[in-house]
């Protein structure tokens, strides 16, 4: 059974045992967090029914580098910056 959960105003379609990366959370590794479950998919009535899901924080990591390149033509102006977003890896324990 799958569920649509919401963490930090972002929605994820998950099932039990999935490991996903979410925006950084204020929790230490090993903590269990309850998050809002918007809908359970795979039941006879897949209507919007709010509930809770439990996720376990595994690790805090940084995402891949995203290159931000700016240029102004004919002016010899170029800027190249990199950005790495802080992410939290969580595992869905129960829906």
Swiss-Prot record:
Report which residue ranges the record marks as coiled coil: none
Q: Which GO terms describe its biological process?
A: translation
Question: What's in the GO CC field?
Answer: cytoplasm; ribonucleoprotein complex; ribosome
Under the heading SUPFAM superfamilies, the entry gives: L21p-like
Q: Which Pfam families does UniProt cross-reference here?
A: Ribosomal_L21p
Is rRNA-binding one of the keywords? yes
**What are this entry's molecular-function GO terms?**
rRNA binding; structural constituent of ribosome
Domain of life the protein comes from: Bacteria
* Signal peptide stretch: none
Protein family (similarity comment): Belongs to the bacterial ribosomal protein bL21 family.
Protein name stated in the entry = Large ribosomal subunit protein bL21
The protein's gene is named rplU
